[in-house]
Design a protein with these regions (language model features):
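RING-family zinc-binding modules in ubiquitin-system proteins
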Residues: 1-277
Length: 277
């Protein structure tokens, strides 16, 4: 009976998308709950429907379910405690349970080892608190990264629109030049072609810059998403794994976010046809 209740409890705290214990859980309008990151990625390229019942959702910005988050934390803490009291986690020197975490070296210590000369000057905390702190650090990093992904998408959309407008502008300007020559200078066909060539050269110069700018934004978008997915996988790990040294991942995430390719806005005045239009 107790085993069945425990299994049912864990099932309720399992994300239907990733099938891991809920991380930063959110509950949508139909009542189903998911990891925030799983829902972000699920809705990114498709209409906002519940992945379970397919009910449409008008809302996309959800607050974390505090109750579910606390319950999920209890499940993770229970798994961590099971490891902490295991024979595998006993100090080989003092035969004590290693219930203290050294923040400096990212290792588990027993009470006596934490007070040794080697570790006395390091920052220590209970392993459970260290795990919770690492999870919060991870969730903040993911939130920041997701905001950067959305910002980058807006820049990409703006660049696509600008390329289309620029191509249209080139066509319209060329038509205007030809119309002006036909109306006012019908005999100057050579000058007309030179004028058109000048226009195309200048216009294509900016068009190429726009396309390169778009390619840079697309590449940044790919890197941001790959980093987000890497952090998401990390967030689904048990606390025992989460307490390993992940500083390199955080450094890479922060470095990627420093890259800020902006949509290019060329000077439309660069296509003015002096002395003619």
């Amino acid at each position: 009976m107790e085993s069945g209740l425990s299994q049912a409890f864990q099932e309720e705290l399992t994300c239907p998308i990733c099938r891991s214990c809920l991380t930063d859980p959110v509950t949508i309008s139909c009542g189903h709950s998911f990891c925030r990151a799983c829902l972000h990625l699920s809705w990114e390229d498709s209409p906002a429907h519940c992945p379970m019942c397919r009910e449409p959702s008008q809302q996309k910005d959800f607050k974390t379910s505090i109750v579910l988050k606390k319950l999920a934390s209890i499940v993770r803490q229970a798994s961590l405690m099971k490891y902490l009291i295991s024979e595998e986690n006993k100090c080989v020197i003092h035969k004590e349970t290693k219930g203290i975490f050294c923040m400096e070296n990212s290792i588990y210590l027993c009470r006596l080892c934490s007070d040794s000369h080697e570790h006395r000057g390091h920052k220590h905390c209970p392993t459970e608190a260290a795990a919770e702190g690492q999870m919060e650090r991870l969730l903040k990093q993911m939130e920041s990264l997701w905001e950067k992904i959305q910002e980058n998408e807006e820049n990409l959309e703006a660049e696509i629109v600008m390329i289309s407008l620029w191509e249209t502008c080139l066509i319209e300007r060329e038509e205007a030049i030809r119309a002006k020559y036909r109306a006012s200078y019908p005999d100057l066909t050579e000058q007309e072609e030179e004028h058109i060539e000048c226009l195309r050269k200048e216009g294509n110069y900016y068009l190429e810059k726009l396309r390169k700018s778009k390619a840079t934004i697309v590449e940044t978008s790919k890197q941001l998403r790959e980093m987000y997915q890497e952090l998401m996988v990390m967030s689904q790990e048990p606390y025992v794994i989460l307490l390993q040294d992940f500083d390199d991942i955080f450094r890479r995430s922060e470095s990627i976010q420093l890259s800020k390719p902006l949509a290019m806005i060329p000077e439309l005045g660069g296509l003015a046809v002096h002395g003619l239009i």
